[in-house]
Swiss-Prot record:
Gene Ontology MF annotations: alpha-1,6-mannosyltransferase activity
A Pfam family annotated for this UniProt entry: Anp1
Superkingdom of this protein's organism: Eukaryota
Family: Belongs to the ANP1/MMN9/VAN1 family.
Cellular compartments per GO CC: mannan polymerase complex
Protein name: Vanadate resistance protein
UniProt GO BP: cell wall mannoprotein biosynthetic process; neuron differentiation; protein N-linked glycosylation
Length: 442
């Protein structure tokens, strides 16, 4: 007689320990779904987890020593999924939320991302965090930095660590070319960023409270498109890029989602400023999928600000007609002249003085900040890594959710702000203006 035994092995890997795999040791084949790493974080360190399915031969007399009742009590957990539907007053009702953040070559934005994590006012004790680190460059230290910050996050010392790092950076008194753009930003924008990060603990009393759990996943998916602004936003790479991102999102969802999660919140790491109550605000509208508006600041010579996420939109007749002219596998890339859909974008509906509680129904959604009920993932909604109704990833996610009868909405006047990433043309213009300044001084 054979008994199938699946067990979990934990081996301790402390931050800074030589046993943490270095970047060059972590290159993985993107085609093997079993080729991944899982790390659990506590206040004391990072523990590597390996899940191995093993078939062991067990003698018949050994089985007689364990009753069915014993097996039932020790191996079976019962969850009534009716208890995890997701309420619009989630924190009040104890709804556990799964916070998901994909990371790739993200070490430069991690201080900002972790500040924004601590700034969340949704009860930290009800939030499970799962990071997915994937397809990073060989010399990138995103994984190691996430290790360090996550441990500090859980033992309450991250604020001090980030302040110390900032002081060391400022003491160097070196202004890099990457900082030049700040001289051309609207002063009120610079002031708002300083206000957001200069005394963050004053934002709410539970800023340092540890989260319910932190898990870090490491898995590559074969993404080779660069992380520069121009690389990521070139129209010719959008279809391929979005499908690979869909695979990564789906993998992370399946790996991290547990039966007791009521809500799932997706968040990009490069959000610069965002209200701390964003989760409660999105949740309060009682939609199955809800997104905020996403803008980004710009230098004064480009107009100060600009809509960033054009993937949240209301379908149009022109968009539907365009889809009819395309091949089944073609992906409509919203916001590009090559695909004239004439859709109403959530971003362009924004009124800076509008009612932040106003909601509009959407068909497509962007992935910068998505709150969704966990039940929709359990019922089959996902981020298509293939062409679905001539869309992929988050826009197809919105279409699929709508097609399956779930409510999808957006807040046109509730805005979060993405960082400004200078394009190649922007950098050329800044260089030209700097040369002009030097000529005027001389």
């Amino acid at each position: 007689m054979f008994l199938l035994v699946t067990y979990t092995i934990y081996s301790r890997v402390l931050t800074g320990d030589s046993r943490i795999p270095q970047s060059q040791d972590r290159q993985q084949s993107p085609t093997n779904d079993n080729n991944h790493e899982v790390y659990k974080v506590t206040k004391d360190g990072v523990y590597k987890q390996e899940v191995t399915g093993v078939v062991e031969e067990v003698e018949e007399e050994e089985l007689k020593e364990v009753t069915t009742e014993d097996l039932y009590k020790s191996n079976v957990d019962i969850f009534d999924l009716n208890d995890y539907q997701g309420s619009q007053e989630g924190a009040k009702n104890g709804d556990i939320l799964l916070f998901l953040m994909p990371l790739r070559n993200a070490e430069h934005v991690l201080p900002m991302a972790f500040y924004n994590l601590m700034n969340l006012t949704y009860d930290h004790r009800l939030i499970d965090i799962a990071f997915l680190v994937s397809d990073c460059s060989p010399d990138d230290t995103t994984l190691e930095t996430v290790f360090e910050y996550s441990v500090a996050l859980q033992n309450g010392t991250l604020v001090d660590k980030l302040k110390h790092e900032e002081e060391l950076k400022n003491s160097g008194n070196v202004r890099g070319t990457s900082d030049l753009y700040q001289s051309y930003m609207e002063p009120s924008y610079i002031e708002s960023v300083k206000k957001a990060y200069s005394n963050p603990e004053s934002h709410h009393p539970n800023y340092r409270t540890p989260f319910r759990s932190v898990t870090i996943f490491k898995k590559d998916f074969g993404q080779v498109i660069g992380q520069g602004f121009s690389d990521r936003h070139a129209v010719k790479v959008q279809g391929i890029r979005r499908k690979l991102m869909g695979r990564a999102r789906n993998w992370l969802t399946s790996a991290a989602l547990k039966p007791y999660h009521s809500w799932v919140y997706w968040r990009d790491a490069d959000i610069e400023t965002c209200p701390g109550d964003v989760i409660e605000e999105l949740m309060s509208h009682n939609y199955d999928v809800m997104v905020p508006n996403v803008w980004r600041p710009l230098p004064t010579f480009l107009g100060n600000e600009q809509p960033y996420d054009l993937n949240s939109w209301v379908e149009s007749d022109a968009g539907l007609e365009l889809a009819k002219t395309l091949n089944e596998d073609d992906v409509i890339v919203e916001g590009y002249a090559e695909y004239p859909t004439w859709r109403a974008h959530l971003a362009y509906i924004r009124d800076a003085n509008g009612d932040p509680r106003e909601v509009i129904d959407l068909d497509g959604v962007g992935g910068v900040s998505i709150l969704a009920r966990a039940k929709i993932f359990r019922q089959g909604v996902h981020f298509p890594a293939f062409t679905f109704l001539n869309h992929a990833e988050t826009e197809a996610f919105g279409k699929m959710a709508k097609k399956m009868g779930f409510s999808v909405g957006g807040l046109p006047h509730y805005t979060i702000w993405h960082i400004y990433e200078p394009s190649e043309d922007d950098l050329k213009e800044i260089a030209r203006l700097e040369r002009k300044k030097r000529r005027q001084k001389s």
